Amino acid sequence: MDWYPLWNSLRIAAISTVIIFFAGIFAAYYIAKLPRLIKGVLDVVLTLPLVLPPTVVGYLLLRVLGPKRVIGAWVLEAFGVKLVMTWWSAIFATTVVIFPLMYRTVRGAFEAFDETLAYSGQTLGLSNAYIFWRIRMPCCRQGVLAGTVLAFARALGEYGAT
């Protein structure tokens, strides 16, 4: 029995999940702090891959990142890297498709966080980084874990965009 497809799927899902773990937390944290109007516009843009069929997302990525398109040609010329039909393009497409799951779940956890805990830390003279990693993240760990599991499961089953 050939196990290569399973290992390939696991590898792509794992790498995409690691990328999305940090990108999703970063985006959710900063967008949760924005004014309501800007937050709404960014929400629509960032969750678009969730509502579009995977084949449409894959087609759009091909149209944007193809070697004869502006972005694809620039990356090919500047770095010598082809952005389509490679192993890394599968990781990129999977990352684009799973991003909304991580982002929305973590943003919900950040918005449910009691800000008085962060304010208390500030009055005690704690740095923002310390407050984020030692107060906010432990309080939001269930949302972060849920988003990570959802993203990994979606990445493992992704076929259409890649």
Where do the protein language model's features map onto the residues?
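Short, highly charged low-complexity linear segments
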Residues: K82-L83, Y119-T123, A161-T162
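Short helix-to-coil transition segments within interhelical loops
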Residues: F113, Y119-C140
